[in-house]
Curated annotation (Swiss-Prot):
Subunit structure, as described in the record: PSII is composed of 1 copy each of membrane proteins PsbA, PsbB, PsbC, PsbD, PsbE, PsbF, PsbH, PsbI, PsbJ, PsbK, PsbL, PsbM, PsbT, PsbY, PsbZ, Psb30/Ycf12, at least 3 peripheral proteins of the oxygen-evolving complex and a large number of cofactors. It forms dimeric complexes.
UniProt KW Transmembrane helix keyword: yes
One Pfam family recorded for the sequence: PsbT
Cellular compartment(s): Plastid, Chloroplast thylakoid membrane
Name of the protein in its database record: Photosystem II reaction center protein T
Domain of life according to the entry: Eukaryota
Assigned protein family: Belongs to the PsbT family.
Cellular component, GO, one term: photosystem II reaction center
Length: 35
């Protein structure tokens, strides 16, 4: 049971960090490079 909780915490933390970086950096690059 504890392993599941720790895994969930790890995944959620990684997801938050990934989303923070993803939404913070590429709003300028893909806007200029539109096909």
């Amino acid at each position: 049971m504890e392993a599941l909780v720790y895994t969930f915490l790890l995944v959620s933390t990684l997801g938050i960090i990934f989303f923070a970086i993803f939404f913070r950096e590429p709003p300028k690059v893909p806007t200029k490079n539109t096909k």
